[in-house]
Each structure stands twice: as structure tokens, then as C-alpha cells.
Amino acid sequence: APEVSFSRKMREDEAKSGIPASLLLQYGMMSLDYVLRVCPPGTRITLLTELDNRTDFWLRDLAYIILPNGECLNELLIRNGFAKASHSYHCIHLHYFQEICRLAQLEKQGIYQFSNIF
């Protein structure tokens, strides 16, 4: 999902996308708002990790977040246009996530209402 604070990664994202950091920050806040609506603080979640893909380039932990109703928060974020699937974050479901990401883009879901890239 987009970043919610100015950081080195946001400056990299700004350079790659051509979108000003201030706008990327707004997109990040939109994604955060969606997460808080779907999974408010205190929600019990289950984290599932892949042994071969536990961290990303920045050594952040990667996991599938399973909600109490069994839905995957990662999938919901992508399907609703508040996160994107990137080849930079390999996982066993990458192809599926890229497909639903493209659908969200075509259907102008979430952030895609404002920009085709983020």
C-alpha cells in the first residue's frame, strides 16, 4: 500500500511514478482509512507468511493478513484499489494479485479513481 509518512521510500516512489510525494501521501492516507474501516484497531487477525518470501528489500516482514471472517486483507486492498501488486514483492499468489489489480485499475476502484498509477 502507499506510504503514510515522508520517507526515503516515498522519495523513491515519487521518482519512479512521477507523482508528487504530497499526492502519494494523500493516497497513503486513503489506503490507511480503508484498512481502518475493514480492520479497526483491536480486530483479531491471523498472519500467514511464506517461508521463501518473509521479508522485502527493505527487510520489512511480509505476510497475508487474514481477517476474522476469513477474507485476506491484502486481497481486499488490491481488489478495491488501495494497494497494487508488484513484481518487486514476490509471493505464490502474485499472478492472481496482478490480475485483480488490473481489474481494479480498469474499474477505477479506490485510488485508481484519481490516477492510473501510484
Annotate the PLM regions.
Residues A1-F82:
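Electropositive
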Residues H87-F118:
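N-terminal targeting pre-sequences for secretion and organelle import
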